[in-house]
Amino acid sequence: PALMGFCTTGEKFDVRTIPESWIFLQDIPIFPFGSQYDEHLEELAEEFKTRPFVMLANDSVLVTGDKLINTFDRLEVADFSARSLILAAPLGSLKPITDDQIEELRVAFHVGE
């Protein structure tokens, strides 16, 4: 439910909150409503070559994994990350993981290459 708040508002879903969120999800693009049915389908399919997760505006999320449990874990991490962003918003602005720190994660965990 929390994740869909980002799909329906167009607010950026920044998963650079904690290392686990970025490692599991990487940076998540958002595609226009109905992209899985129209001329965006090929572009959408291309995204899954380099990332496991995409959002569809006012629609849903698409997530992949090599096993069902892995796919579910990503969805669960995404929803908890979304919930943490929503709950933290009244406390102040997000202090995301930096690009340098992301590069360290990319190298250490062999993701997003």
Whereabouts are the PLM-identified features?
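Glycine-rich flexible loops
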Residues: P1-E113
